[in-house]
Amino acid sequence: MNESTLSIKQLADMLRQDARDLEKMASRGYLPARRVGGEWTFATAEIHEWLEKRLPDYSDDELSRLDSSHAPSNDLLVCSMLAQDSIELDLHARTRTSMLHEMVKIAERSWQIWDPQALLASLREREQRSTTAVANGVAFPHPARRLPDALGESVVAFARMAEPLNLGAADNRTTDLVFMVACRNDATHLQVLARLSRLIMREELMDALRVATSPRAIWDLLAEAE
């Protein structure tokens, strides 16, 4: 077993689920899996893509299990990666491509982006697979794969769009709040997406983010919510 694959036990630990339930899901084709030497193995990239597609439909309890799988759930996770300098309140972008380009520039203000071109290319690759827009007018653009050599530390950047974009969200709503997530490893990546997915369930928080008047106010709202 290597970093590109997971055993049934590793997957059970990651998802906080019973291994027997996962075996049933794999045998019924609900999970992307392969039999190797009589044992189920799971490609890490396939599992993460499978999870990303299902996160919007997860309950708060299910998200909480993912959220707390690698660190205490009451820790400031998103805000520990979100510099106030990487918060933009009036982002002008008319296309998905220009939005991604601007998000990389916003993330660069953290001084943790070592290879912005590699990050941008991977963001575009991920968007070509399927939209990262979710419900409630929010999008979570992120690289197609983790880029440890392109980042000093894991980074979150936030932007509120000057004009909402149609990014193809399942609820047909345009997107006006964007959280770009760029993590150095898969575990942190999933935890951040789970935490953000929980946060956007809070309508009062989303309403407050849409009227906040400063980057500090945005950061404080998110920190209080975490």
Positions of PLM-derived features:
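Cytosolic covalent-transfer regions centered on His/Cys nucleophiles
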Residues: 1-226
